Regions:
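Bacterial N-terminal signal peptides
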Residues: 19-30
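N-terminal signal peptide c-region/cleavage motif recognized by signal peptidases
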Residues: 32-34
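N-terminal secretory signal peptides that target proteins for export/translocation
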Residues: 1-15
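Residue-level detector of alpha-helical transmembrane segments in integral membrane proteins
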Residues: 11, 26-27, 211
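Enrichment for repetitive, rod-forming helical segments
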Residues: 15-16, 25, 65
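Short hydrophobic/aromatic segments of transmembrane alpha-helices and their interfaces
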Residues: 18-20, 68-69
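Transmembrane beta-barrel domains of Gram-negative outer membranes and organellar outer membranes
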Residues: 36-259
């Protein structure tokens, strides 16, 4: 299903978490575990986008009390290779009032639909390769299942991802993270709901509860259709909670031109 069918099934996105540790370090904080993937916090959803191209602009922030806000602008281009496979290349920068903007990672994301309406629950496989462009170098891979279902006019998403770093991304334990979304189709041009993200630590030995990350908050989505194949899609969320046990606020925004 194409992103242009948002009145029937909507779209959103994400990735996951090494940038959080860098954000805390930039803010002058120490952090125990290093998360591997330089993230963008957008809930991953997968649709039949065959033949559609996607120009992608993303922007997200982390703000801790009495610390400078750290920002991550991102730019990408995606393509629906087939009815089941969507691929995207994008770059992520990082900066703050105390650190000049610099290229952080280059990323290649692939999402493959395993079911297309045969079951009450849609299932897909997400995989992302991350190449660190900062001094430490190295790379990371993130992968895991993407789950989606509908209850009336409300779409429910739940994803669990693992990521593992190599080289400068610290070849340590494989880490586990989660993301979820509730999206209600109120009007064809306006959907609202909530999103949540978290990092649990090593997949087989979670961090203590007070060292984990859990954030959630309200989200809004809108679509401006130009014709049957072209549209602007915009989503934004404001998240409250913690980053590895420290209080933090996050803002995420994503604007796409689908054509």
């Amino acid at each position: 299903m194409s992103p242009l069918t948002l009145s029937r099934r909507s779209a959103a996105r994400s990735r996951a978490s090494r940038g959080l540790s860098l954000a805390l370090l930039c803010a002058g904080c120490a952090i125990a575990p290093a998360a591997h993937a330089d993230p963008g916090y957008y809930v991953v959803t997968v649709y039949d986008n065959e033949g559609l191209r996607n120009a992608d602009l993303r922007y997200w922030t982390v703000k801790m009390p009495n610390r400078p806000e750290v920002v991550w602008p991102e730019v990408g281009f995606g393509y629906g290779v087939s009815s089941r496979w969507t691929t995207e290349l994008f770059a992520s920068w990082i900066g703050s009032s105390q650190m000049p903007m610099q290229l952080s990672t280059l990323n290649w994301q692939n999402d493959v639909l395993l079911t297309q309406g045969e079951l009450p629950l849609d299932i897909a496989l997400h995989a992302q390769l991350i190449a660190n462009q900062l001094d430490a170098g190295g790379s990371a891979i993130e992968w895991g299942p993407v789950l989606q279902t509908d209850v009336g006019r409300t779409q429910l998403n739940g994803n669990v991802f693992l990521d593992h770093g190599y080289g400068g991304f610290e070849n340590g334990p494989t880490l586990m993270k989660y993301q979820w979304q509730i999206r209600h189709r109120w009007k064809p041009w306006l959907h609202f709901g909530a999103q949540g993200f978290g990092e649990l630590g090593p997949w087989d030995h979670w961090l203590p509860r007070d060292k984990q990350s859990h954030r959630a908050g309200p989200a809004a989505f809108t679509t401006i259709r130009l014709d049957d194949k072209q549209a602007f899609l915009v989503q934004a969320a404001y998240l409250f909670g913690s980053v590895y046990g420290r209080d933090a606020r996050m803002f995420t925004m994503r604007a796409q031109f689908v054509f």
